[in-house]
Swiss-Prot record:
Keywords: Cytoplasm, Golgi apparatus, Lipid-binding, Membrane, Protein transport, Transport. This is Sorting nexin-3. It is found in: Cytoplasm; Golgi apparatus membrane; Prevacuolar compartment membrane. GO terms for biological process: endocytic recycling; late endosome to Golgi transport; protein transport.
Amino acid sequence: MAFYSAGPLSPGYNSTSAWGGNDNAEEDPWAAPGSSSSAAPPTTSSGFAPSPPGGFASFSTQQQQQQQQQQQRQQAGYFGGAPAAGASLAQEADAYQDGLMETSFGVGSGAGQNRLGGAAATVNPQSPHNAHSSSSTYGSAISSTHSQPSTQSQQPQSHALPSSAAQAQAARAGAFPSGVSTSQYQPTSQGAQGASRFQSHTPSTLLPSEPAGFTSHTSSDYSATAPRQLAPGYPLPASNYTVPAYSPFARVDSLSTPRRETVEDMYGVPENFLEVEVRSPLTHGVGRKMYTDYEIVTRTNIPAFKLRYSSVRRRYSDFEYFRDILERESTRVNIPPLPGKVFTNRFTDEVIEARREGLERFLQVVAGHPLLQTGSKVMAAFLQDSGWSKDQWL
């Protein structure tokens, strides 16, 4: 966009300045050092020639003037006849006068001319010409106007980097503001260091097949042929790795060869056994004095019993006294109940058989209890003493 030009009646009118105002070069912040507004070249700070008083510059005129100014800057070496502010800063920053100082700010796209980048111009031949682009508002004179390519700007200067690799590095560095060092992001001349992309401490069964393009080109410790690891410091087992014949979690006695049992062991007498059987019910008496007794057969090798085999007869009333005595001797054991009494038809075969089964179940539970076997005195006598009497225990 072209700037408005101050008219003749405007205060501070100046025909040589598009901004108007002041002839004093020291008060003009956009003037070049060592020059005044009256002696300045016809180029203004906006990059366009001064417009005629009270009007606008045409598009074709500004385009021609812009091309002429671009050619003049290219022939002058940097930016024009007068020394630019960026060039003076470049001379002050180059303490060794070798033209190889580090980038500090605002590097332009012309990487081979000035790495300080005080006032470089952006050249893009593919883009259309933009005659309405304005200059930088901060005075670094970096113009975004796209112009035609020139052969002189592409020629290497006397202070350019000595090699094409250095020029490419400077061109890459120009894309970063404020001179950010990009050396850590640049590829090295050697092959990719380290292992390939799929070579890690992840178990190999979880990794996909490694493509041929990701193999390593260096002979480092983690080469492409190095075996994958399950964990750091723990390599994979050998291919001939075999499972041990025994499990480390098995019991010690199960590791030894099992001993074959003989016929005597299979059918012999157990170490501890106790068998109590109630059988052969008999009914005695006549009339009101009738009663039924039962035979108790005991087979055992437990030391608490004096006899290995015994056979005694007890009636139902004897069982009732025996249970009462057990409750008094062993308070810590719950004594099971006896089968209930029958008042009618108590001598029938069905009633007698049901009572026999109940009495046998009662004796098996009581005689098999470990506390009653070691702590009861009446149990062995009741099961094996043929002369047992309730009067001896009451």
